[in-house]
Amino acid sequence: MMRTLITTHPLLLLLLLQQLLQPVQFQEVDTDFDSPDDDMEEFEEYLEEFHRTGPTRPPTKEKVERRVLIEPGMPLYDRNYCNEEIMRKNVYHKQRCVTEHYFLLMQYDELQKICYNRFVPCKNGVRKCNRSKGLVEGVYCNLTEAFEIPWCKYESFYRRGYVLITCTWQNEIQKLIPHTINDLVEPPEHRSFLNEDGVFVIPP
């Protein structure tokens, strides 16, 4: 049969062999993608912090804004608030879940001014904290399950109270800046609680 093909259709066979012997050509795939500079810088910073083995980097305005401060949107009393926001904002410490965290509904300038308020005892009673003069809305997140990402599970608590923070001096700008959120202390008349159905009840 092969001999018949060669003798009767030599041109067809030649074209077929030419196609088979042609080097395989791979189409170049452009793997580059457009990403805003801010998002890429944030992602690189997250990777650096994620794999860091030394001391935690000192706080910056951008880091506090990204991890602590929130904008109006998702209801603060949503019971899944912490699980969603902690994942979205990449709030972790060296590949492990943070045991607690605070989200505050306020602007950075307002938070920074608290650094110049009077001292009060921190909730652990060891250090001194600065306390806000007015009440601030926020969410307290308490770790309930797992210790390593991405299996962190949190219980969410809406709070409206006085913010306790620690501050640190930043030489570059010659100012005190927020370092950690120590607590969000509710006055007794403003404390939120769960009713019998497990729904958060927020007093006016």
From Swiss-Prot:
Database matches in Gene3D superfamilies: Ribonuclease A-like domain
GO biological process, one term: defense response to Gram-positive bacterium
Pfam families with a match to the protein in the record: RnaseA (PF00074)
Lineage: superkingdom: Eukaryota
UniProt entry keywords in alphabetical sequence: Disulfide bond, Glycoprotein, Secreted, Signal
Cysteine disulfide partners in this protein: C97-C152, C115-C167, C122-C129
Glycosylation sites: N130, N142
Coiled-coil ranges from the UniProt annotation: none
Annotated signal peptide: 1-26
This protein's GO CC annotations: extracellular region
Gene Ontology MF term list: nucleic acid binding
CDD domains found in the cross-reference section: RNase_A
Subcellular location: Secreted
Function: Does not exhibit any ribonuclease activity.
Similarity field: Belongs to the pancreatic ribonuclease family.
Protein name per the record: Inactive ribonuclease-like protein 9
Organism: Papio anubis (Olive baboon)
High-level lineage: Eukaryota, Metazoa, Chordata, Craniata, Vertebrata
